[in-house]
């Protein structure tokens, strides 16, 4: 499964993920309207301005004229890492918005949240006690 994030600026999104240590895998179009970043075995697609959006229950278009771009923001994605605190330090150094600092949560996960410029949240975590 590969999540698709609807974004407002492809280059800003590539740059934001590169600050996290991810790499740009590919892009499509001139200028790009679709693309991907990857980290290890994980890949996330980007789509410019709502292509392939959900559309909701009101039979709104998912792409093109009449699409409700505001309804397409706010996706959360969980990303599992080896060291949450190292990722936190990298985010601080790169100026990435920290929405929630590294915290040991009652459900047994040390996690932090970072916010993408379009409002998507990456929930970065590791099971407490995992080696």
Where do the model's predicted regions map?
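Vicinal oxygen chelate
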Residues: 1-4, 19-115, 125-131
């Amino acid at each position: 499964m590969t999540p698709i994030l609807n974004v407002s600026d492809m280059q800003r999104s590539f740059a934001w993920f590169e600050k996290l240590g991810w790499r740009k895998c590919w892009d499509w179009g001139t200028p790009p309207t679709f693309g991907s970043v990857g980290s290890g075995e994980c890949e996330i697609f980007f789509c410019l301005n709502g292509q392939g959006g959900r559309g909701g229950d009101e039979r709104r278009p998912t792409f093109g004229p009449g699409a409700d771009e505001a309804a397409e923001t706010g996706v959360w994605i969980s990303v599992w890492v080896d060291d949450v605190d190292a990722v936190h330090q990298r985010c601080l150094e790169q100026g990435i918005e920290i929405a929630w600092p590294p915290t040991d949560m009652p459900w047994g996960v040390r996690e932090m949240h970072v916010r993408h410029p379009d409002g998507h949240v990456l929930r970065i975590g590791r099971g407490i006690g995992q080696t």
